Amino acid sequence: MDRKQSGLIFFAIVSFLLYAFGVQLFESVWSFPSIRKVPLMVIALVGTGIFATVRLGFPQIKYLRHGINVTSGKYDNPDDKGDLSHFQALTTALSATVGVGNIAGVATALYYGGPGALFWMWVTAFFGTTLKYAECTLSVKYREINSQGFTAGGPMYTIENGMGKQWKWLAIAFAGFAIICSFATGNAIQSFTVSDQIYSESLQLFGPDHFLTMKRSFLDLFQFSFQQVLNGIILSAVVGLVIIGGIKRIGQVTGYLAPIMAVIYVISAVLILIYHYDKVMSAFALIFNGVFNPTATVVGAGGGALMTMLNTMLMGVKRGLYSNEAGQGSAAIAHSTAKTNFPVREGAV
């Protein structure tokens, strides 16, 4: 065995161990302190959102009109510090949530948590809006601008510049976990979804023995087809052409694509609701009945009524976070680049 093969095997083993550790860590964090109590992450996310909402006077309602005016460009000033307009900063953040997170995330919540999980997704979204308001405002307030005029912000800068240098270790920890998270929820899931969908269609079109769809083994650990590799190369090339231009190029591209994605998503949802208008009220009944109903059919929720309710709540909050990123902190990194001298304006956006 030469050095190249040894390196590939070592990389494959390390990747597998990191994946296994990441899955176990993810499940442990979300189920802590125990599977028969309300998980700490649910209390932290929803509880903090409720406290901030009440303490700040329901900003998601109070500043809604102002946020729309800011996003429309009413207060744009090209001389303000920053890299992107308010609209571009918003679309950059939205590009990470519109699509897989809103569609696959909701479907997963329904499958594992039952109809009642949608209620907890609504709760997470409503109170999570205040968390986004706070984290985006703070990220603009405590961002840094280098000598070339480019901005750098996010929760890591908020922690270090707002809480003091003694908390720099926490800022570094957040940045590290954010990088790890970006590989999974920010890239791997979307790439896999695109590749898997194209592969499924190609499999029906060409069959399993075609050179594009035939599975090949890699070190007896992974199996993939030539088309899946090709999909990855094309996606990497397209993304590379965008990100090589920096945050301004990203903002320009998302400024065009994100609104199209959002319009298609909303129109599709409305058309589905119109087509199934006779089932809308019964769907609402299922959702509210499944919130605290211990007889709801929930996958993997053995252990009685309490476990069923906790699983429904947990899946709703988990997928709610994945769908809107409220409280995660990643959206604030994009919003911190907005051109404004008034941090609260970007918070309202």
Residue ranges of predicted features:
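Membrane-interfacial loop-to-helix junctions in multi-pass transporters
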Residues: 36-41, 75-83, 115-116, 164-171, ...
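Membrane-embedded translocation segments of transport machinery
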Residues: 244-248, 252-255, 260-331, 335-336, ...
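Alpha-helical membrane segments and immediately flanking helix-loop junctions
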Residues: 79-111, 138-162, 169, 173-176, ...
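Helix-loop-helix module between adjacent transmembrane segments
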Residues: 52-53, 94-95, 124-149, 156, ...
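Transmembrane helix-loop boundary segments of multi-pass membrane transporters
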Residues: 27-37, 108-125, 189-196, 210-224, ...
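Membrane-interface loop-to-helix entry segments
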Residues: 44-68, 192-198, 227-289
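N-terminal alpha-helical transmembrane segments of multi-pass membrane transport
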Residues: 1-100, 110-117, 128
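Hydrophobic alpha-helical segments of integral membrane proteins
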Residues: 25-36, 60, 64-72, 155-158, ...
